Amino acid sequence: MKIIKHAFEKFDERTFTPEMAAKLVHGRCLFRRSNSFPDRYIAIGEVDGKIWSIVLEKDLYTVVTARRAHKDEENLWHSR
């Protein structure tokens, strides 16, 4: 997994770690295409009891950013 500088900055801001990103991506997660950026994907999953979203480049290897899941993403996760 490649993590760009912006993602590291956001990880620190949001108390998210590279280990948490690996746990989410390599565990059970949902992938969906980003509505805002068609060349990016969003991985949605649960880490440490919280639902997170990781934005990935189209190679599904490069992490752009991570954030707590939006409400619609949480609903999608719970309805899987």
Predicted regions and their residues:
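Ribonuclease/tRNase effector modules and their secretory precursors
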Residues: 1-80
